Amino acid sequence: MPSMRIGIVCPYSFDAPGGVQAHVLDLAEKFISQGHHVEVLGPASESTQLPDFVTKGGASLPIPYNGSVARLSFGPSTFIRARDFINRGQFDVLHIHEPNSPSFSMAALKVARGPIVATYHASSNRSLALKFALPFLRGQLEKIRGGIAVSEMARRWQVQMLGGDPILIPNGVETAQFELNKKPLWSGRIPEIVFLGRLDEHRKGLDILLRALDQLDQEVRVTVIGGGNHPLAPRVDFVGRVSDEEKAEILGRADIYVAPNRGGESFGIVLVEAMAAGCVVVASDLEAFSAVCDAQSPEPSGILFRNGDADDLASTLRNVIENPKFGQELVTSGTQRAKEFDWDNVSKEIMRVYETVCDGTTVTAA
């Protein structure tokens, strides 16, 4: 496979952690390790520590987007920086993530000409900015030669709302990083439960987990990862934001990963990371989580509870803790499931899309 020059555009600020940002950086590093030249553009302050292959696009603003608050960058300077990034890069392919986002992604799509690939992460959008941008977007989206959706939900939303027919390629995980710290399930020790997410964001569902914990008679250790203000809670260790290495270490020593999210999820990358680390995954019955856990199969990779129902979550946790054999079956299935999302496999699928759209020309910006 000949070496490619690849430009990747991220709409969300690297100043704050997020699934799309992590996906972009991981994909870039994977392709660099395979001998390709990769550059990334996205919002980021000068003080934010990032790899040298990232062009920092400057400050961003918090904007309500997709049921959450995203830090985006827009305005004349965004278009100027996107144009400079493209013309300087001489890329064989430009990979734009979330081209619907009013940030560097939308700007890059507007100015770019040539082989363009887009990845859609979101499965719904209630952004007022997007509603205003839809007439403009539909014309611009015709420039995309290869579309990718990270989940069936994201693919379906894109088809219904904006047209096109992206192919399904999931998010990737470096499974080996999480397998390194894997420990046997609890046996003669107190089981550990882990939650990861922004603590003060209602849709992440931390309050549901805390209410469920109040109903547990079994002794458990609970570790909560994530930034934001947190309530006082007995037997809960709030560790704040952690590095990727620390996250892998915590998941590796843990026994159960709980994802009580209320909605706004199109995939669930941390579920895959937890599976790779050997955790039992307990998640709300969102469509995205059900798909990741392969919940309808004879050997599911995780167990679901009714969305928003702390009583059902408590009952589910009780069942897992009291039945280690059942927990081990979920771990075994989850470990195999996680391998399907390994970056080695995912990057090959993405590269096939690149090879399909490339025609020997260079991406330019008008």
Task: Report each predicted region and the residues it spans.
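Short hydrophobic beta-strand element within catalytic cores of glycosyltransferases
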Residues: V280-A283
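Conserved acidic donor-binding segment of nucleotide-sugar-dependent glycosyltransferases
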Residues: A295-D311, N319-K325
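Acidic anion/phosphate-binding donor-loop and adjacent secondary structure
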Residues: R156-V159, P170-I190
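A short, well-ordered alpha-helix in the C-terminal region of glycosyltransferases
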Residues: D312, F326-E340
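Membrane-proximal helix-turn-helix segments that form the acceptor-binding/catalytic region
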Residues: S124-G147, M153-A154, Q160-M161
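Carbohydrate-associated surface elements
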Residues: A44, M153, G172
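N-terminal strand-loop element at the rim of the active site
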Residues: C10-P17, V24-L25, E29-S77, R81, ...
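Conserved donor-binding/catalytic core segment of Leloir-type glycosyltransferases
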Residues: L185-K204, L210-D214
